[in-house]
């Protein structure tokens, strides 16, 4: 676990992302423009601004890892889902992340 309640540690995230990416759903809660400029391979874009009205469209069957560029929006997404759908398994990545168009990234935990 990361430092914030509900967060996943960067090392744990990177291990899952590299070794078992199909074991989780990655949801990028940034705006589409940010998403188009680079994201994690296999991620789904579901902006925080639309999340509440799309809660029933969230994928089920595997845990969800929410992420954004700095951890604030992903933390809000996690809290929102826990409030309305507490049975869902979700965590968020509390980290500063920068992507390039080719999918490369740098990540720094909080």
Residue ranges of predicted features:
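Short, surface-exposed ligand- or partner-binding patches at beta-edge/loop junctions that are enriched
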Residues: 67-68
